[in-house]
Amino acid sequence: EHEGWLASLRNNPHTRIWAILFKGKIQGAVSLTAIDLKHKTADWAFYLSPETQGKGVGGIVEFKLLELAFGEMGLEKLNCEVLVTNPQVIKMHEKFGFRLEGTRRANILKDGLRRDVALLGVQAHEWQEARSRFTRLYGTQ
């Protein structure tokens, strides 16, 4: 069953998923979904294991993903969703040029409660404006 799911991802031109390796172990995943080459847009998301969070890995992942999306892939807009109960991640995205575009009220059921989801987006030119802050930290490739 899992092999079939993985094969479907490999053959899906609208989805790309990568494992996040940290200290030689898979510690999460990063994905581009809803890739639309006509409109040059995509949605992106990532997950880090609890033991990897707070170690700067999220910033590296975001930088590398933005470089790929706006560089090699030629996208012009990326979107993401974050639970409003996770302000640290919202702030991190904003440092990379993302802007709050809206809120989906009570959109997710988590821990038995309805939770709001923040909708964020960044355009290629906004990433270019923010990018210089990160190239010294993360390099250019």
Regions found by a protein language model. Give the residues of each.
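Acyl-donor (CoA/ACP) binding surface of acyl/acetyltransferases
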Residues: 17, 21-141
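Active-site rim helix/loop that mediates acceptor-substrate recognition in acyltransferases
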Residues: 1-15
